[in-house]
């Protein structure tokens, strides 16, 4: 890393070429503070959301991340959040498996999906959208 260059975190920190969200509903938490703010916002907004807890070193996480980003364009009413467990150690200390997906509705966690599978994730997103 060049001196003076900011460390890339969240989705940028993965180093993957990822599709962006044309609807602005894809967010990335690069710190515990950011993730806490996003969780507080979810609780007050009551809009449906999914959080993808992953890690930059997790091969399976890297495989599901491009579809996760793509799905943010398909499911416009869901808020999509990516949180790297190494960048958010306090708020993710209960995450024991990567990737883990948490689904929120009306400010409450209503579902959890461990592991991956593009079709499985798509079906779960459809269910909660």
Curated annotation (Swiss-Prot):
SUPFAM superfamilies listed in its UniProt record: Thioredoxin-like (SSF52833)
Pfam families linked to this entry: Thioredoxin
Stored Gene3D superfamilies: Glutaredoxin
Residue positions of the active site: 58 (nucleophile), 61 (nucleophile)
Chain intervals with Polar residues compositional bias: 19-30
Basic and acidic residues compositional bias, start-end: 1-10
Disulfide bonds: 58-61
Keywords: Disulfide bond, Electron transport, Redox-active center, Transport
Keyword Protein transport tagged: no
UniProt keyword Electron transport present: yes
Domain Thioredoxin: 7-129
Sequence segments annotated as region (Disordered): 1-30
Similarity section: Belongs to the thioredoxin family.
Full protein name: Thioredoxin-like 3-3
Organism: Oryza sativa subsp. japonica
């Amino acid at each position: 890393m060049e001196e003076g260059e900011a460390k890339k975190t969240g989705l940028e920190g993965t180093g993957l070429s990822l599709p962006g969200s044309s609807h602005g509903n894809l967010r990335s938490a690069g710190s515990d503070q950011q993730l806490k703010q996003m969780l507080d916002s979810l609780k007050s907004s009551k809009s449906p959301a999914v959080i993808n807890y992953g890690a930059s070193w997790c091969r399976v996480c890297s495989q599901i991340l491009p579809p996760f980003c793509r799905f943010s364009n398909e499911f416009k009413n869901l808020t999509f959040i990516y949180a790297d467990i190494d960048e958010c150690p306090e708020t993710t200390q209960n995450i024991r498996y990567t990737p883990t997906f948490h689904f929120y509705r009306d400010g409450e966690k209503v579902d959890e999906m461990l592991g991956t599978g593009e079709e499985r994730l798509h079906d779960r997103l459809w269910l909660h959208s």
